Amino acid sequence: MTPGARMQAVIELLEQIWSGEEPIDRLTDVYFRKRRYAGSGDRRSIHATLYDVLRHRARLDWWIGRTGSSLEAGPRTRIIAELALEIKSSPQETKAIFNGATHCPAPLSDPEAELAEALYGRPLTHPDMPSPVALEYPDWMDRSLKTLWPERLAVEMSALN
């Protein structure tokens, strides 16, 4: 599979995950059973990117909102952000992945290309992020977790993610 085809697979899986109630492992098993052509390296890469996007969701969404983009935080947008922030793909590399070729994601729209440009070179975690975003836990747990681990919150939450 090409890098673009791998990213398209991640986008398709994220769409299924966020639109249903099926467990992720079951969705990925069914997805790959229907796509026997995907080798073990492809599956490993797709799983790694998929779980990275899930683990980084709050930070990706924060960055997407921070750019002032009119784009909604959805599977495509989060992949673009993941490529720029975590994988460190340049805007040109991101455009090469989103090339519209067979089995690849459709070409980037102008707002998506602007997002890739705006996020490239930035760190995934920013000092202005609130704790629930930076450490990837729900807002409603903030007070309880800060009470439980007043000095070790970052260490403990990093261990969970």
Where are the regions a protein language model picked out?
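Class I Rossmann-like S-adenosyl-L-methionine
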Residues: 1-161
